[in-house]
A protein has these predicted regions:
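Mid-protein regulatory/catalytic core that forms ligand/cofactor-binding pockets
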Residues: 56-198
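Short secondary-structure junctions
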Residues: 8-9, 74-80, 233-243
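Accessory beta->alpha helical hairpin/"wing" motif in late/C-terminal subdomains of nucleic-acid enzymes
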Residues: 4-42
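C-terminal regulatory/effector modules of DNA-binding transcriptional regulators
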Residues: 137-326
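Conserved aromatic-histidine-acidic binding/catalytic patches
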Residues: 12, 50-57
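A short, surface-exposed helix-loop junction/capping segment
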Residues: 38-52
Length: 326
Protein backbone atom coordinates (compact mmCIF):
# COMPACT_ATOMS: atom_id res chain seq x y z
CA UNK A 1 0.00 0.00 0.00
CA UNK A 2 2.89 2.37 0.71
CA UNK A 3 4.46 1.57 -2.66
CA UNK A 4 1.15 2.37 -4.34
CA UNK A 5 0.94 5.66 -2.39
CA UNK A 6 -2.29 4.67 -0.66
CA UNK A 7 -0.97 5.00 2.90
CA UNK A 8 1.86 6.94 4.46
CA UNK A 9 3.71 6.63 7.76
CA UNK A 10 3.10 9.27 10.40
CA UNK A 11 5.62 9.43 13.27
CA UNK A 12 5.25 11.94 16.07
CA UNK A 13 5.72 11.96 19.85
CA UNK A 14 7.40 8.53 19.66
CA UNK A 15 4.18 7.07 18.23
CA UNK A 16 4.14 5.55 14.76
CA UNK A 17 0.96 5.20 12.75
CA UNK A 18 -0.42 5.07 9.21
CA UNK A 19 -2.66 7.50 7.39
CA UNK A 20 -4.62 7.24 4.19
CA UNK A 21 -3.43 9.42 1.36
CA UNK A 22 -5.78 11.65 -0.62
CA UNK A 23 -5.64 9.14 -3.50
CA UNK A 24 -6.69 6.31 -1.18
CA UNK A 25 -9.66 8.27 0.16
CA UNK A 26 -10.81 9.14 -3.34
CA UNK A 27 -10.50 5.51 -4.42
CA UNK A 28 -12.55 4.21 -1.48
CA UNK A 29 -15.23 6.86 -1.98
CA UNK A 30 -15.51 6.04 -5.68
CA UNK A 31 -15.69 2.27 -5.11
CA UNK A 32 -18.21 2.33 -2.26
CA UNK A 33 -19.49 5.81 -1.32
CA UNK A 34 -22.29 4.55 0.94
CA UNK A 35 -19.80 2.56 2.98
CA UNK A 36 -17.03 5.11 3.40
CA UNK A 37 -18.50 8.60 3.12
CA UNK A 38 -19.32 8.74 6.84
CA UNK A 39 -15.64 8.03 7.61
CA UNK A 40 -13.88 10.03 4.90
CA UNK A 41 -15.91 13.20 4.35
CA UNK A 42 -16.74 16.29 6.38
CA UNK A 43 -15.52 16.94 9.91
CA UNK A 44 -15.80 13.36 11.09
CA UNK A 45 -13.03 12.27 13.45
CA UNK A 46 -11.63 9.72 11.01
CA UNK A 47 -11.28 12.36 8.28
CA UNK A 48 -9.33 14.93 10.28
CA UNK A 49 -5.62 14.95 11.01
CA UNK A 50 -5.20 14.28 14.72
CA UNK A 51 -1.89 15.13 16.35
CA UNK A 52 -2.78 14.61 20.03
CA UNK A 53 -1.45 11.29 21.31
CA UNK A 54 -4.69 10.44 23.16
CA UNK A 55 -6.82 10.94 20.03
CA UNK A 56 -4.41 8.95 17.86
CA UNK A 57 -4.45 6.07 20.33
CA UNK A 58 -8.25 6.22 20.44
CA UNK A 59 -8.42 5.97 16.62
CA UNK A 60 -5.98 3.06 16.68
CA UNK A 61 -8.14 1.26 19.25
CA UNK A 62 -11.22 1.83 17.08
CA UNK A 63 -9.42 0.31 14.10
CA UNK A 64 -8.31 -2.59 16.29
CA UNK A 65 -11.91 -3.16 17.39
CA UNK A 66 -13.19 -3.09 13.79
CA UNK A 67 -10.55 -5.63 12.79
CA UNK A 68 -11.61 -7.98 15.58
CA UNK A 69 -15.26 -7.61 14.50
CA UNK A 70 -14.30 -8.21 10.86
CA UNK A 71 -12.45 -11.43 11.69
CA UNK A 72 -15.39 -12.58 13.81
CA UNK A 73 -17.76 -12.05 10.87
CA UNK A 74 -19.81 -9.32 12.58
CA UNK A 75 -21.20 -6.57 10.27
CA UNK A 76 -20.32 -3.00 11.24
CA UNK A 77 -20.29 -0.94 8.02
CA UNK A 78 -23.27 1.47 7.75
CA UNK A 79 -24.35 0.19 4.33
CA UNK A 80 -25.03 -3.36 5.61
CA UNK A 81 -27.32 -2.53 8.54
CA UNK A 82 -30.41 -0.41 9.22
CA UNK A 83 -29.96 3.03 10.77
CA UNK A 84 -31.71 2.57 14.09
CA UNK A 85 -30.14 5.49 15.96
CA UNK A 86 -32.12 8.21 14.26
CA UNK A 87 -35.29 10.14 15.01
CA UNK A 88 -37.22 8.48 12.18
CA UNK A 89 -36.41 4.82 12.83
CA UNK A 90 -39.14 2.45 11.75
CA UNK A 91 -40.43 -0.42 13.83
CA UNK A 92 -39.59 -3.73 12.24
CA UNK A 93 -36.63 -2.38 10.28
CA UNK A 94 -34.36 -4.70 12.25
CA UNK A 95 -35.13 -8.32 13.08
CA UNK A 96 -33.56 -10.85 15.41
CA UNK A 97 -32.39 -12.90 12.44
CA UNK A 98 -30.21 -10.04 11.22
CA UNK A 99 -28.20 -10.03 14.46
CA UNK A 100 -25.39 -9.74 15.43
CA UNK A 101 -24.74 -6.15 14.35
CA UNK A 102 -22.31 -3.55 15.64
CA UNK A 103 -23.08 0.17 15.99
CA UNK A 104 -20.22 2.57 16.73
CA UNK A 105 -20.50 5.13 19.52
CA UNK A 106 -20.52 7.92 16.93
CA UNK A 107 -23.60 6.40 15.27
CA UNK A 108 -25.41 6.33 18.62
CA UNK A 109 -24.52 9.94 19.43
CA UNK A 110 -26.04 11.10 16.14
CA UNK A 111 -29.36 11.04 18.01
CA UNK A 112 -28.34 14.45 19.35
CA UNK A 113 -29.46 15.92 22.70
CA UNK A 114 -30.87 12.56 23.79
CA UNK A 115 -27.31 11.26 24.18
CA UNK A 116 -25.78 14.31 25.90
CA UNK A 117 -25.35 12.52 29.22
CA UNK A 118 -23.44 9.61 27.67
CA UNK A 119 -21.08 11.57 25.43
CA UNK A 120 -18.16 10.94 27.78
CA UNK A 121 -18.59 7.17 27.68
CA UNK A 122 -15.41 5.26 26.81
CA UNK A 123 -17.30 2.66 24.79
CA UNK A 124 -16.41 1.85 21.19
CA UNK A 125 -20.06 1.09 20.47
CA UNK A 126 -22.61 -1.63 21.03
CA UNK A 127 -22.81 -5.17 19.73
CA UNK A 128 -26.40 -6.32 19.37
CA UNK A 129 -26.60 -10.10 19.75
CA UNK A 130 -29.78 -12.22 19.70
CA UNK A 131 -29.81 -12.76 23.47
CA UNK A 132 -28.45 -9.42 24.76
CA UNK A 133 -26.65 -6.18 23.96
CA UNK A 134 -22.92 -5.93 24.61
CA UNK A 135 -21.30 -2.56 25.21
CA UNK A 136 -17.83 -2.81 23.68
CA UNK A 137 -14.69 -1.27 25.19
CA UNK A 138 -11.03 -1.51 24.19
CA UNK A 139 -8.46 -0.99 26.94
CA UNK A 140 -5.48 -1.60 24.63
CA UNK A 141 -2.25 -2.17 26.55
CA UNK A 142 -3.13 0.08 29.50
CA UNK A 143 -5.97 0.38 31.99
CA UNK A 144 -8.84 2.33 30.42
CA UNK A 145 -10.06 5.67 31.79
CA UNK A 146 -13.42 5.13 33.48
CA UNK A 147 -16.30 7.27 34.68
CA UNK A 148 -18.74 5.05 36.57
CA UNK A 149 -21.79 7.31 36.42
CA UNK A 150 -21.49 7.84 32.67
CA UNK A 151 -21.36 4.10 31.99
CA UNK A 152 -24.36 3.52 34.27
CA UNK A 153 -26.28 6.14 32.29
CA UNK A 154 -25.27 4.41 29.05
CA UNK A 155 -26.60 1.12 30.43
CA UNK A 156 -29.92 2.74 31.32
CA UNK A 157 -30.16 4.58 27.99
CA UNK A 158 -29.70 1.37 25.98
CA UNK A 159 -32.29 -0.51 28.04
CA UNK A 160 -34.81 2.26 27.37
CA UNK A 161 -33.99 2.99 23.73
CA UNK A 162 -33.82 -0.64 22.57
CA UNK A 163 -36.88 -1.79 24.51
CA UNK A 164 -39.02 -3.74 22.08
CA UNK A 165 -36.66 -2.84 19.25
CA UNK A 166 -35.99 -5.61 18.40
CA UNK A 167 -35.95 -7.16 21.88
CA UNK A 168 -39.00 -8.13 23.90
CA UNK A 169 -39.06 -5.80 26.87
CA UNK A 170 -35.86 -4.33 28.23
CA UNK A 171 -32.82 -6.04 26.70
CA UNK A 172 -30.13 -7.44 28.96
CA UNK A 173 -27.10 -5.16 28.78
CA UNK A 174 -23.67 -6.75 29.20
CA UNK A 175 -20.19 -5.44 28.51
CA UNK A 176 -17.13 -6.74 26.67
CA UNK A 177 -13.66 -5.37 27.30
CA UNK A 178 -11.01 -6.12 24.69
CA UNK A 179 -7.30 -5.67 25.23
CA UNK A 180 -3.87 -6.42 23.83
CA UNK A 181 -3.51 -9.87 25.41
CA UNK A 182 -4.71 -12.05 28.29
CA UNK A 183 -2.23 -10.41 30.66
CA UNK A 184 -4.38 -7.28 30.47
CA UNK A 185 -7.18 -9.24 32.15
CA UNK A 186 -5.00 -9.56 35.26
CA UNK A 187 -4.43 -5.81 35.34
CA UNK A 188 -8.18 -5.21 35.04
CA UNK A 189 -8.99 -7.76 37.76
CA UNK A 190 -6.55 -6.10 40.17
CA UNK A 191 -7.18 -2.45 39.25
CA UNK A 192 -8.47 -0.26 42.07
CA UNK A 193 -9.15 2.73 39.83
CA UNK A 194 -5.87 4.54 40.30
CA UNK A 195 -5.04 7.40 42.67
CA UNK A 196 -7.93 9.58 41.48
CA UNK A 197 -10.31 6.65 40.87
CA UNK A 198 -10.43 7.67 37.21
CA UNK A 199 -9.36 4.31 35.76
CA UNK A 200 -11.32 1.12 35.14
CA UNK A 201 -12.16 -1.17 38.00
CA UNK A 202 -14.79 -3.88 38.33
CA UNK A 203 -17.86 -2.09 39.67
CA UNK A 204 -21.64 -2.37 39.40
CA UNK A 205 -22.03 -0.52 36.09
CA UNK A 206 -22.57 -3.90 34.36
CA UNK A 207 -23.61 -7.13 36.05
CA UNK A 208 -21.70 -9.13 33.43
CA UNK A 209 -18.37 -7.92 32.06
CA UNK A 210 -16.52 -10.22 29.65
CA UNK A 211 -12.90 -9.92 28.59
CA UNK A 212 -11.30 -11.09 25.37
CA UNK A 213 -7.95 -10.27 23.76
CA UNK A 214 -7.63 -8.69 20.32
CA UNK A 215 -6.02 -11.90 19.06
CA UNK A 216 -7.22 -14.93 17.06
CA UNK A 217 -8.21 -16.56 20.37
CA UNK A 218 -10.31 -13.55 21.28
CA UNK A 219 -11.99 -13.57 17.88
CA UNK A 220 -13.12 -17.15 18.50
CA UNK A 221 -14.55 -16.17 21.87
CA UNK A 222 -16.37 -13.21 20.29
CA UNK A 223 -18.00 -15.54 17.75
CA UNK A 224 -19.18 -17.66 20.64
CA UNK A 225 -20.60 -14.75 22.65
CA UNK A 226 -22.84 -13.60 19.79
CA UNK A 227 -24.18 -17.07 18.98
CA UNK A 228 -26.25 -18.26 21.97
CA UNK A 229 -27.17 -21.50 20.22
CA UNK A 230 -23.50 -22.52 20.13
CA UNK A 231 -23.06 -21.53 23.78
CA UNK A 232 -26.08 -23.64 24.73
CA UNK A 233 -24.67 -26.61 22.83
CA UNK A 234 -21.30 -26.23 24.55
CA UNK A 235 -22.94 -25.82 27.97
CA UNK A 236 -24.98 -28.98 27.49
CA UNK A 237 -21.86 -30.93 26.55
CA UNK A 238 -19.84 -29.64 29.50
CA UNK A 239 -22.64 -30.22 32.01
CA UNK A 240 -23.75 -33.61 30.69
CA UNK A 241 -21.79 -35.68 33.23
CA UNK A 242 -21.92 -33.23 36.14
CA UNK A 243 -24.33 -32.78 39.02
CA UNK A 244 -26.98 -30.08 39.12
CA UNK A 245 -26.65 -26.76 40.89
CA UNK A 246 -27.18 -27.05 44.63
CA UNK A 247 -29.33 -24.58 46.56
CA UNK A 248 -27.33 -25.46 49.67
CA UNK A 249 -24.18 -23.92 48.17
CA UNK A 250 -24.45 -20.17 48.88
CA UNK A 251 -22.34 -18.95 45.99
CA UNK A 252 -22.57 -18.57 42.23
CA UNK A 253 -22.03 -21.83 40.34
CA UNK A 254 -23.36 -23.82 37.38
CA UNK A 255 -22.97 -27.44 38.53
CA UNK A 256 -21.39 -29.70 41.15
CA UNK A 257 -18.86 -32.51 40.94
CA UNK A 258 -19.06 -35.99 42.50
CA UNK A 259 -17.80 -34.59 45.82
CA UNK A 260 -20.38 -31.82 45.88
CA UNK A 261 -17.91 -29.05 45.05
CA UNK A 262 -19.25 -26.12 43.00
CA UNK A 263 -18.28 -25.81 39.33
CA UNK A 264 -18.26 -22.60 37.31
CA UNK A 265 -18.38 -22.41 33.51
CA UNK A 266 -15.97 -19.55 32.86
CA UNK A 267 -15.06 -20.00 29.20
CA UNK A 268 -16.96 -16.78 28.41
CA UNK A 269 -14.53 -15.00 30.75
CA UNK A 270 -17.17 -13.02 32.60
CA UNK A 271 -14.92 -11.16 35.04
CA UNK A 272 -17.81 -10.40 37.38
CA UNK A 273 -18.87 -14.05 37.74
CA UNK A 274 -15.28 -15.24 38.07
CA UNK A 275 -14.66 -12.66 40.79
CA UNK A 276 -17.84 -13.58 42.66
CA UNK A 277 -16.96 -17.29 42.45
CA UNK A 278 -13.47 -16.69 43.83
CA UNK A 279 -14.78 -14.47 46.62
CA UNK A 280 -17.50 -16.96 47.57
CA UNK A 281 -15.07 -19.87 47.79
CA UNK A 282 -12.80 -17.83 50.06
CA UNK A 283 -15.63 -16.59 52.28
CA UNK A 284 -17.10 -20.06 52.83
CA UNK A 285 -13.77 -21.88 52.90
CA UNK A 286 -14.66 -24.18 50.03
CA UNK A 287 -12.79 -25.56 47.04
CA UNK A 288 -14.22 -25.43 43.55
CA UNK A 289 -13.77 -26.28 39.90
CA UNK A 290 -13.53 -23.89 36.98
CA UNK A 291 -13.96 -24.78 33.30
CA UNK A 292 -12.45 -22.47 30.69
CA UNK A 293 -10.45 -22.37 27.46
CA UNK A 294 -6.81 -23.40 27.61
CA UNK A 295 -5.51 -19.93 26.71
CA UNK A 296 -7.38 -18.42 29.68
CA UNK A 297 -5.91 -20.63 32.41
CA UNK A 298 -2.51 -18.92 33.00
CA UNK A 299 -3.99 -15.54 33.91
CA UNK A 300 -6.71 -17.12 36.07
CA UNK A 301 -4.14 -19.13 38.01
CA UNK A 302 -2.21 -15.92 38.53
CA UNK A 303 -5.24 -13.99 39.83
CA UNK A 304 -7.50 -16.42 41.68
CA UNK A 305 -6.74 -16.98 45.37
CA UNK A 306 -9.23 -19.71 46.27
CA UNK A 307 -8.57 -23.45 46.07
CA UNK A 308 -9.65 -24.12 42.50
CA UNK A 309 -9.13 -27.05 40.13
CA UNK A 310 -9.01 -26.08 36.46
CA UNK A 311 -10.46 -28.04 33.55
CA UNK A 312 -9.54 -26.77 30.10
CA UNK A 313 -11.35 -26.71 26.78
CA UNK A 314 -8.97 -27.25 23.87
CA UNK A 315 -9.50 -24.21 21.64
CA UNK A 316 -8.39 -26.01 18.47
CA UNK A 317 -10.79 -28.89 19.08
CA UNK A 318 -13.58 -26.43 19.84
CA UNK A 319 -13.00 -24.59 16.56
CA UNK A 320 -13.13 -27.84 14.60
CA UNK A 321 -16.10 -29.33 16.41
CA UNK A 322 -18.34 -26.29 16.92
CA UNK A 323 -17.27 -23.65 14.40
CA UNK A 324 -16.15 -26.13 11.72
CA UNK A 325 -12.90 -24.23 11.27
CA UNK A 326 -9.47 -25.82 10.67
Amino acid sequence: LKAEHLIRTHYRDALRGYRLTKAAKEMLLSVSPLRFQCYLTGNTETNLIRSEVSRRIRLHQKAETYLTLLHAGIPFYPDVKPDIFCNHREAGSIGMRSLPLFYASREIKELGPETTKIRNSRSMGILMAPQCVYVLYNTGNGVLKWEYRTEVRLNAFLQHYLQGYPYNGHPQIRAIMTGTDMEMAFRLFTSTGGYKKSLFMLDTSFEHFHYLPNTPEGEVLLKLLVHPEIMEKLDNLLLSDLGCRSDSIPLEHDATDASGNPILLAYDFDMQRINRFNTGLNVYGRSGNLICFDFQIPVLKKYLTATIHFSSIDLCKFKRGFLHEP
